[in-house]
């Protein structure tokens, strides 16, 4: 009888899969479970090869593995009202776990969470300041957020880049939002420390695209950055990497990726080993772990928290939520080895190296590294 009931339940739930979704939605993964996962995108789309895409892929893979309903939604515009509209559409279609990547969701969470107490809201890169101070949400009884210590990932990428012999650097951030600022400031601090240790002169041209995608204007600005001497540019902002890499490819230049190991993307698209390294945060792993906690019925162990993920171990690189690729994704050499990297990670973990995480100022500062601050390109 139990087996028959289970079969009927699967058929009943599968039948509902024919319901249509939002204006832009991936094919829903529709099986059976009490947990139904929706993801709403922020500024970008699930093809940004970075933050949105990684979150989407983590949610989709988890749903497929566990037989859960999954669908993604893309807001019509870049504002809280449109984000709330997609959240409400997802809830109306039966989704009860809403995953939202990006600080811009703070206002939407603050508006929607109190109205839908039976729904679990998961915000990635949504800080206490964003959610509580800025958006004014005081009741987190159905909310869990994660922030990442991007300054550590940025530091490690900047340190590695200079140690590997690059002293003419560039930085192209997406928009001057907290996570992007922390990445960039960390990159500057790491490059500064490495230059000081090596006793070399180093400089960085520092700009923001003021958007999270590449276009002709950003490419022209990157052309100028490489023409002005940059050997490698940190492409820190979703789709802006297209402009950085297009400009780099014209002069056989180099690039640093962000959020995930972008070497497979960069190198394949531009036909040579363009990637020095990537400043990564554990989006995929932390999204998967959160969804597993929910599926295991342990939501009460994390709800109401804003987790701040960084280094969890001085020795186990795989346990850390921030870092650079330890495999082929980094351009290792005798100048900077995996053992050298492990020592820096241990020094940060043990407090020997302290990294400033100030995200209040878009313009970074350094002691040895010379900074040419360009500001917004657009």
Where is each model-derived feature located?
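Positively charged n-region of N-terminal signal peptides that target proteins for export
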Residues: 1-4
